[in-house]
């Protein structure tokens, strides 16, 4: 992992969503979320580390009382392909019991990670589970769940920026980019 490799990744990518489109989509998503859960005093859980940027952009637009925490479940480990093994680094707190829980994540690829989160949270006694993702990847196979709120559908390519990384790089970009050949 080095600066040259990071620049190589960026050079072999293309912008698919602009920073302005990201901002507008997040504002619209916040309104939709508020319409559904503003009276529920939801527990909002951010999935680290990918959802950090998305969460930071979304939370200021949620203009209702909520409680916030984070969880960390990973499958990727700085690669561009998800692994079969999921690793809980920070599990949900007991505060999910008898709560409406909204989970924020950067992207829903195959849906396996979000399904595992949903199953764990519901088993812990949440009354309702909702998910919001910045992106959902369009893929051929069926998914165990779809997000309740989604900013963008993206093609079945490796995407990064706005919290999503490419080989550990570029979570900090304000745009969403897709790798091209040669990355």
Task: Tell where the protein language model's regions lie, with residue ranges.
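PRPP-associated nucleotide enzymes
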Residues: 1-183
């Amino acid at each position: 992992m080095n600066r040259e490799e990071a620049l190589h990744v960026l050079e072999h990518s293309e912008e698919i969503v602009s920073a302005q489109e990201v901002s507008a989509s997040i504002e619209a998503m916040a309104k939709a979320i508020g319409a559904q859960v503003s009276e529920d005093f939801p527990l909002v859980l951010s999935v680290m580390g990918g959802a950090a940027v998305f969460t930071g952009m979304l939370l200021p637009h949620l203009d209702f009382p909520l409680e916030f925490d984070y969880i960390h479940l990973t499958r990727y480990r700085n690669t561009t392909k998800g692994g079969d093994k999921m690793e809980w680094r920070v599990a949900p707190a007991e505060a999910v019991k008898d709560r409406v829980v909204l989970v924020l994540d950067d992207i829903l690829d195959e849906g396996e990670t979000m399904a595992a989160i949903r199953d764990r949270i519901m088993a812990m006694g949440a009354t309702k589970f909702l998910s919001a993702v910045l992106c959902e990847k369009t893929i051929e196979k069926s998914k165990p769940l779809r997000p309740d709120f989604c900013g963008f559908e993206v093609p079945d390519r490796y995407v990064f920026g706005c919290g999503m990384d490419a080989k550990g790089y570029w979570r900090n970009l304000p745009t969403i980019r897709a790798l091209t050949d040669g990355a």
